[in-house]
A protein has these predicted regions:
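Alpha/beta enzyme core
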Residues: 1-229
């Protein structure tokens, strides 16, 4: 299996430039948000901008036609099959895709269409493990699993889920390795209590204390007052 480190960012391009400089050896893709481009010319321009900033590949969940336009210009593209959030209404919402044979065939066909369009890989999201493994074994491209099992070439999770940095539901296919949201809640209480203590000290004249003050010696202070008379 591939040992590949991929970070996918749908960020403003100047934000990515800073990230690229901080992680020069990491293979990075930058996503073109769905609907951002309305023509092949626009999607090529967006892809070129992303590569110019130092990205290794472009993520795009739009049509094979748009993707082919980019790959013809030698832009490495990663597509998306299975449960694609931007087009989830067509597959029944946020749920697994491919649990019956007709859906599984469509995932296979979608993967092949993207392969024919020239992608270097696809993100395969919420597809049954056996289906994902079969497609992986019968494809020439990199299959990146998002909840589609160990049989794919690489694994992908959102950092927010790995860190549990949000209070929302963690999906079944994800695994948390920390609980930053819990720690942040504690930190926010500490910050709140500190601000309340500061306000109380000011109101009761406990702050500032002598150790917080800057002093002038009596002789210099007298000179200061005399000079103003």
């Amino acid at each position: 299996k591939l040992n590949i480190s991929i970070s996918n960012f749908e960020l403003k391009l100047f934000d990515f430039y800073s990230i690229r400089n901080a992680a020069k050896k990491t293979f990075m893709t930058v996503g073109i948000p769905y609907g951002h481009c309305s023509s092949e010319k626009e999607v090529i321009k967006a892809g070129m901008q992303i590569l110019k900033l130092g990205a290794d590949a472009v993520y795009c969940s739009m049509s094979p036609e748009f993707i082919k336009a980019m790959t013809k210009e030698k832009i490495p593209v990663i597509g998306h099959v299975g449960m694609v959030p931007a087009t989830k209404s067509w597959t029944g919402g946020f749920k697994a895709v491919g649990k019956n044979s007709s859906e599984a065939i469509k995932v296979y066909d979608d993967t092949k269409r993207l392969e024919d369009a020239g992608v270097i890989g696809v993100e395969m999201e919420l597809v049954p493990t056996k289906v994902a493994e079969y497609i992986t074994n019968n494809s020439e491209i990199i299959i990146i699993s998002m909840g589609s099992g160990k049989g794919c070439d690489a694994q992908y999770l959102f950092a927010e889920d790995i860190f549990a940095s949000h209070p929302d539901h963690i999906p079944r296919h994800a695994k948390t390795y920390a609980n930053i949201n819990k720690e942040m809640t504690k930190i926010e209480k500490i910050k709140h209590d500190a601000l309340v203590s500061f306000i109380n000290d000011v109101n009761s004249q406990k702050f500032p204390e002598d150790k917080n003050l800057i002093f002038i010696n009596d002789n210099e202070y007298s000179k200061f007052i005399d000079s103003l008379k």
